[in-house]
UniProtKB/Swiss-Prot annotation:
Substrate binds at residues 19-28, 110, 137-138, 213, 251, 364. Belongs to the succinylarginine dihydrolase family. This is N-succinylarginine dihydrolase. It comes from Yersinia pseudotuberculosis serotype O:1b (strain IP 31758). GO terms for biological process: arginine catabolic process to glutamate; arginine catabolic process to succinate. It comes from the Bacteria. The lineage of its organism: Bacteria, Pseudomonadati, Pseudomonadota, Gammaproteobacteria, Enterobacterales. Keywords: Arginine metabolism, Hydrolase.
Length: 447
């Protein structure tokens, strides 16, 4: 049976704004208080989706979450009508209003960790919602994510959905942004690589400036839930030094597809041992690791972070080669572009680059890889996915028109308290659930 790596990209939400909420994410803090353009942000994401779908890649769409999250504010003691809640929090806790209005669910690489059926003992695709414990504005996503994913992957014969791990420091889990899969054909067993920033119950190397968001204990728990074979699972510590330079998730410093791992030389602690372990486990599957390690002398960690070179999408092509999807910022940086130009002109597996303008997302700290959740599916599983979320030319037009109808073209912090913005969002999302055939997935629809 054939297998596919399907990308499910997040639609940017109507409250996309620059609040600097993500300590450790340097783009987020750098652009705090800038004016955003939610309409442009959504269209930039849709254009990337369409371009990849036009190339023949399977492409799905995941909806944004309801924001501002009025229900969260009520749990925190705000009361009265929705308008009164917004007014009260804007006056007395403005940073809290910004947090509950974040459109960060667009970065679906953090929605969940996904293991294909070929790797799971029960032969089903497993999803574990990420608790995103380290950041409040992200942690509040888990409840709705746990409703959205079963609305898309809605067949118990093929899909297993696990709720988020307990939201405690010991079990901080950031989802697929700290997870890679290395092997051959998508439908065949592969090695699952979990990357963590620190150990919660043991001493060890940790960053000193920025937080390590993912724990080894969380990664191990997800692997157990997904019924993975320990012989085909590796747990790797990210280099604390690069976390302190703004590499808040592993997908800011590494990306993989099939048997190719593209990463910075400083990405991992004990890198030589890590690569030896992966090679050994891949050999058990009769696969050979192709390790593309970018030297610090050619591309510094600082340049990798500012351009999101590794927050790219590595896509397998029909001719056996690979395509690298990069943000415009990578082309604009002389040293990064020089490296990439030499890379694709060589005899390695990556022979093509596609550049996308994703500046609205990039300024908040999310590149091409952040915007997508990779889900490996075989033919039967792909047929079991809610077909209305799969991007077609007609759906692209419908979603573009939907964005034009509902999204504002500029947004500042003061706009978040506007009750009209809340109503605009609910009207738009209610319509979107009908377009994508999701059912009542949002709190306002269920209440």
């Amino acid at each position: 049976m054939a297998g596919y790596e399907v990308n499910f990209d997040g639609l940017v939400g109507l409250t996309h704004h620059y609040a600097g909420l993500s300590f450790g994410n340097e783009a987020s803090t750098t652009h705090q208080n800038h004016t955003s353009n939610p309409r442009l942000a959504a269209k930039q994401g849709l254009l990337k989706m369409k371009a990849l779908a036009d190339l023949g890649y399977k492409q799905g769409v995941l909806p944004p979450q309801e924001r501002p999250a009025i229900g969260v504010l009520r749990k925190l003691g705000f009361s009265g009508s929705d308008e009164q809640v917004l007014s009260d929090v804007a006056r007395n806790a403005p940073r809290l209003l910004s947090a509950v209005s974040s459109a960060s669910s667009m970065w679906t690489a953090n929605a969940a960790t996904v293991s294909p059926s070929a790797d799971s003992a029960d032969g089903r695709v497993h999803f574990t919602v990420a608790n995103l414990h380290n950041k409040f504005h992200r942690a509040i996503e888990a409840e709705t994510t746990a409703v959205l994913l079963p609305a898309v992957f809605n067949n118990h014969r093929h899909f297993v959905h696990h709720n988020a791990l307990p939201s405690v420091t010991l079990l901080g889990d950031e989802g697929a942004a700290n997870h890679n899969r290395l092997g051959g054909e998508y439908a065949s067993p592969a090695i699952q690589m979990f990357v963590y920033g620190r150990q919660g119950m043991e001493s060890g190397a940790v960053p000193g400036r920025y937080p390590a968001r993912q724990t080894r204990e969380a990664s191990q728990a997800v692997a157990r839930l997904h019924q993975l074979d320990p012989k085909r699972t590796v747990f790797v510590q990210q280099n604390p030094a690069v976390i302190d330079q703004g590499v808040f998730h592993n997908d800011v410093i590494a990306v993989s597809n099939r048997n190719v791992l593209f990463h910075h030389e400083l990405a991992f602690l004990s890198s030589t041992q890590v690569m030896d372990d992966i090679r050994c486990k891949m050999a058990g599957l009769e696969q050979q690791l192709v390790n593309i390690e970018v030297p610090e002398a050619e591309v510094s960690v600082a340049d990798a972070v500012s351009t999101y070179l590794f927050n790219s999408q590595l896509l397998h092509k029909a001719n056996g080669k690979m395509l690298l999807v990069i943000p415009q910022e990578s082309q604009d940086n002389p040293s990064v572009w020089r490296y990439l130009s030499e890379l694709v002109s060589g005899d390695g597996p990556i022979d093509e680059l596609r550049v996308f303008d994703l500046r609205e997302s990039m300024r908040n700290g999310g590149g091409p890889a952040c915007l997508r959740l990779r889900v490996v599916l075989n033919d039967a599983e792909l047929q079991a996915v809610n077909s209305r979320v799969m991007l077609t030319p007609a759906l692209f037009v419908t979603l573009n028109n939907w964005v034009d109808q509902h999204y504002r073209d500029h947004l500042q912090f003061k706009d978040l308290a506007d009750p009209h913005l809340l109503q605009e969002g609910r009207q738009a999302l209610d319509e979107l659930t009908r377009i994508l055939n999701l059912g009542p997935v949002y709190p306002f629809q269920r209440n």
